[in-house]
Amino acid sequence: MTTTDTTIQHRTAEPPTPQQKRTTFIALMIVFLLSALDMTIISTAMPRIVADLHGLEIYAWVTTVYLLTSTVMVPIWGKLGDMYGRKLILILGISIFVGGSWLCGLAGEFGDLPILGSGMIQLIVFRGIQGIGGGALFTSAFATIADLFEPRERAKYAGLFGAVFGLASVLGPVIGGFFTDHGTVEIFGT
């Protein structure tokens, strides 16, 4: 059995200034908020989505597949972040997340597709893609906090992430309900 060295190779550059730390933290909170909103916004939109895409018997998978794929990807994204850097993984995660959101908005627009089937199956597959990106967002955010701040400061910043998630839990269903009144596609940003 071999062990791997998971220590992060820091560049010889100067450590980030307090202003750079604040800016980075605010950007991470925005990313975290969008990912957390995505988990909660869909709950109030599901009745409309099911009516549009006709998949009552499998509607629970729309939420489940996102949570499943994002959770499974956490250790993978974490290791990749250790190997290739947090910024690269965060940008890759944002790209996958946004691409998955765009695809979710298109689910069912082209009828039954040979590999992806009906609109509801398409939505489930695309939510899985979105979850893969979402896992990178959560992982990169918490790992970057560990990189930026001393151990005694980390709990405070992790707690602020918890507050952002609480805010998303309250705002998500409200925003989802608002967008549902204007059509289901808008919750995915298309």
Model-derived features: positions:
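Transmembrane-helix bundle of Major Facilitator Superfamily
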Residues: 2, 8-190
